[in-house]
Amino acid sequence: MNEKTKVQVQGVPETMLQTLYARAQESKKPNHHIYDERAIEVVSRLDYDFSKAESDKAMSLGVIARTIVLDKLVGDFLSHYPHAVVMNIACGMDTRCYRMEGKYDRWYNIDLPETMAVRSRFFEEQGPIFQIAKSAMDASYMEDIEYHGEPVLVIIEGLTMYLSEADVKQIFDILDKRFSKAVVLVETMSPFVVKHIKEKSIEKSAAKFSWGVKNGAALEQVIPRFKNKRDVSLVEGMKVLMPIYKVIGKIQAVRNFSNKICVMKK
């Protein structure tokens, strides 16, 4: 029997294990809507109590819906720009770099040192996938990004709702100072949801939602150097998972309250 690896994380970093578990569980279904071989492999090696994630079906559905939406957006970008540089901010245990392997020149997974200490135990990433163990609010991480004018894609998934508006501004300011052009796919949460909705697994991990924005147009007011090209509601991913969303997804209130991927461009 293979020895399992025990990890100690709490607060926001703990959510990365819950989302990893959600992707692994979906991938093991006969009729899976995403397939994440790396997630299955890592979960099988972890000595960790996944009961919080197992009991939170709403969180799991949201994770898979988000994965469906982002995989399409990232895949579409890379099909147009096969020599792109991709930056995954607050990557956690995300494995999209493997699902998109061969479609980009360089991929940088960026997260806090304590998070990357866990990631590096399961993923050896030394090119063309690289790890940067720094905060996205620490401008020095840009020193580790090799850039020669290639198209740039930045992914910010599952992060902004745990930050302040000042933090979000700082992240985009660092991007603005480094790149003359860039596309950012950033997940946002409705202010109403931040204030009134609680996910069971998130609450149990001691992570707290703290910031939200209505849509990409409102986000543009916060970061005016980046223009909102469009918003993609996670309802689009839910339509794949649950056909009833093809009906209820037309209700504006449902779309308003759902998380969005805002496509921001400089």
Could you describe each region identified by the protein language model?
Residues 1-87, 91-134, 148:
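Rossmann-like AdoMet
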Residues 140-149:
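Short amphipathic alpha-helix with an adjacent loop that forms part of the alpha/beta core around
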Residues 154-155:
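A conserved beta-strand element that flanks and buttresses the S-adenosyl-L-methionine
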Residues 162-175:
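A short, conserved alpha-helix within the catalytic core of class I
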Residues 178-191:
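Conserved beta-strand signature within the Rossmann-like core of class I S-adenosyl-L-methionine
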Residues 191-207:
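Short, glycine-/aromatic-enriched active-site segment of Class I SAM-dependent methyltransferases
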Residues 206-236:
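Short alpha-helix
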Residues 239-266:
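Core SAM-dependent methyltransferase catalytic element
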